[in-house]
Structure formats: C-alpha cells, structure tokens
Amino acid sequence: MTAIDKIQVLDSIEKELLLCLQSAGQALLELSKEKTSQKATETHTNQFLKSLNIVESKLSEQINYLTQVSTGQPHEGSGYAAAKVLQMAWHRIQHVKSRIKELEECKIKYVQATNRLQTQRTGPNPGSGGVM
C-alpha cells in the first residue's frame, strides 16, 4: 500500500465521518420540527448508524494494518497515549450510540403525544370501537 493509497483511505474515512455527523444533525433537526416526519427521522438515524459502523470498521482496518506493518521491534516509548486515544474514541462512539437511543425514545414519546392530541381534537375514529 503506497502513501497515496493510505492518504486516500484516510480521506474516505474522514468523508464518511462527515456524512455521519451530517446525518446525526439532520435527524436532530427533523426531531426539533413542530411536525416531525417519522420516516425522515428514521432514514437519517439509519444513515447515521450505517456511517458510524463504516467509520468504525475502516478505522479498525487501519489500526490492524499499522499493527501488521510495525517493525516488530519493541517500542522505546509508551503505548499508553495511543491506547488512551483509542479508549476515548470508543467511549465517544458509545456515548453517541446512547444519545441516539435517547433520541429514539424521545421521538417515540413525541409521536405518542402527538397522536393523543390529534385523537383528542378530532375524536375517536368510527372504526376504533368508540360509542356512537
């Protein structure tokens, strides 16, 4: 793998990460609207999760590649900093996943509340078993 190939791979990871952040922002924007589209929110959320998985797998590939091409000589410095960076990145990924889960729960509550309000305004549907 040439240096240009490595840079191109890292560039594609960066672009995927930007797509991931864009999707998260679009999902949040959709949830903040007064009239939320559940389909649009789910589409953006699914795109976010897909992009996040791609970024995670590509970064893992790069880490594995770097491990394989290492000289095999013991490192004179400490590996603590790299391990800490990796740990913090993993923590951030987990945090983002938990925030997405919270957003999904908020979305469900919002949709349920909206449905209740619509039912109260329009009354029960004729086929819903209401007394006539």
Curated annotation (Swiss-Prot):
Primary role: Component of the Mediator complex, a coactivator involved in the regulated transcription of nearly all RNA polymerase II-dependent genes. Mediator functions as a bridge to convey information from gene-specific regulatory proteins to the basal RNA polymerase II transcription machinery. Mediator is recruited to promoters by direct interactions with regulatory proteins and serves as a scaffold for theQ9P086 assembly of a functional pre-initiation complex with RNA polymerase II and the general transcription factors.
Complexes and interactors: Component of the Mediator complex.
Entry GO terms, CC: mediator complex
Species per Swiss-Prot/TrEMBL record: Aedes aegypti
GO molecular function: transcription coregulator activity
Family: Belongs to the Mediator complex subunit 11 family.
Keywords: Activator, Nucleus, Transcription, Transcription regulation
Annotated InterPro entries: Mediator_Med11
GO BP annotations, alphabetical order: regulation of transcription by RNA polymerase II
Principal localisation: nucleus
Gene from which the chain derives: MED11
Name of the protein: Mediator of RNA polymerase II transcription subunit 11
Subcellular location: Nucleus
Keyword Nucleus: yes
